[in-house]
Design a protein with these regions (language model features):
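Non-catalytic substrate-recognition and accessory regions of acyl/acetyltransferase enzymes
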Residues: 1-60, 67, 71-184
Length: 184
C-alpha cells in the first residue's frame, strides 16, 4: 500500500534507511523530520525520536500527528520487515488540539487505534505530557494500522496538507458567487 499523501526519505532525499533521520514530505512540501531514529543492535527494534515540524506542518489547522505517525510505522513495516517492535515517546505541543491533557488523550487514542501496548502517560515539568508506548509487528496490529492509516489518508487527500487556505479561499469565492443568487 503506497502512500498518496506522505513520502518518507532519508537525508538528501535518498531512500530511507533505518537509523537515519526520517524526512517526511507531501508533494514537494517538507513537513519535518523524525530524529533520532534509534535501531537496536539486532536490527529488530526501532525507537522513533522527536518529530520536528516545519512551518507547513506546524501551521496546518488539522492535526497531522496521527497521519505522520501511522505513515512512519507503515513505512518501517513495509520496507523493513525485520523490525518487530517500534517504540516512541512524544510530548511536542499540538496546536489547535487544546490543553496538554487533551493532546495526550488524542495521542493515546491514536496509539490504541493501531494496537500499541505499554502506553504510558507521564507529566513533565514544563507542563507538557509525554505519551509513550510500543507497537509490535503482528497480523492484527498491521491490519489495524492499515485501516487507521487509510482513514487518515482519506482526510488529507481531498485537501492536501499546507493547502487548507486554498480550500478556504475556494469556499469563500463560491459563497460570494452563490450569495447574490440566493438574495435575488
Amino acid at each position: 500500500m503506497d502512500s498518496q499523501v506522505i513520502q518518507i526519505a532519508g537525508p538528501g532525499g535518498a531512500p530511507y534507511q533505518l537509523g537515519q533521520p526520517m524526512l517526511m514530505f507531501t508533494g514537494g512540501l517538507f513537513l519535518g523530520r523524525v530524529d533520532p531514529v534509534h535501531l537496536d543492535e539486532r536490527g529488530t527494534e526501532v525507537h522513533l525520536g522527536n518529530f520536528t515540524p516545519t512551518s507547513v506542518a506546524h501551521d496546518e489547522p488539522r492535526n497531522v500527528g496521527a497521519l505522520l505517525f501511522y505513515e512512519a510505522c507503515a513505512h518501517i513495516a513495509r520496507h523493513h520487515p525485520q523490525v518487530l517492535l517500534i517504540s516512541f515517546a512524544s510530548s511536542r505541543p499540538m496546536p489547535g488540539i487544546g490543553d496538554p491533557a487533551h493532546q495526550a488523550a488524542a495521542r493515546v487514542a491514536a496509539l490504541e487505534r493501531i494496537g500499541a501496548s505499554d502506553i504510558q502517560v507521564t507529566p513533565v515539568q514544563s507542563g507538557l505530557i509525554t505519551v509513550s508506548g510500543t507497537w509490535a509487528y503482528n497480523e492484527r496490529n498491521l491490519r489495524d494500522l492499515h485501516v487507521a492509516l487509510e482513514e487518515q489518508r482519506a482526510i488529507f487527500r481531498s485537501v492536501p496538507i499546507g493547502r487548507g487556505d486554498r480550500w478556504t479561499g475556494w469556499l469563500e469565492r463560491l459563497r460570494r458567487v452563490l450569495l447574490p443568487v440566493a438574495r435575488g
